[in-house]
Amino acid sequence: DIAALQKADLDAMIVSMRDAGLSPNSINSYTRVLKSFFSWCNEQGLTRLNIPLYKAEETVKETYSDAELTALLKKPDIRKTTFAEYRDWVIINFLLNCGSRAATVRAVQIRDVDLDGGVVFYRHTKNRKAQVIPLCSPMIAILREYGRYRGGESTDYLFCTETGTQLTESGLRQSIARHNMRCGVQKTSIHLFRHTFARKYLIDCGGDAFTLQKLLGHSTLAMTKHYCAIYDADLTKNYDNFSPLAQMKAGGAKIKMPAKGR
């Protein structure tokens, strides 16, 4: 009998979900659905039960350390590496410049990158809203070089397999994991680059939460608050002052192409 339900019953359900290993976000999703359902029940006079959303303690999101990033950003020797290994290094740089989701990285096409304008267009995003993301100077140089090796048509995927096809979700994750392990970094999560981008953008690069919201493609600022507290910043500063990639590469050597014929 739904009318016999008490708050204690719902508390017990939350405890059972927590004991089953569900994440706070998953538990919140379930309680949000129940809250909507019982709001309707209350309107119909079936119950008088108010369900608060599950509140969990905010935990600090794991990120890559500067030492780990330095190892991951070390450029492979193009004369000795495979295309896949070189591509993975470019993707690592792209993730740290843009804070992209893995699905977005897979969806970017060659035509979406405007190197002269210094931006990349996201046409396929989680919230189905197109985005324009700035590229810092080091990222532009890296993509120019990558484009010369990658080749392809404008509608081809920017980050492809060695046969030119789109990377699968598992293929991308496995490639990044292998790259990290080759560099001696035990963390292998591609999503950690998104967390790292958010932390470094705000703390190390002086960015602000409102601009970060746009860069991460969050629909509301509340979503961005899961990554950070709000910081004030000058929105007119050059993106090179904000980009985590530019900050890591400050003072670094320019890209050198191998001699022709080798």
Show where each model-derived region lies.
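Conserved catalytic core of the tyrosine transesterase superfamily
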Residues: 1-262
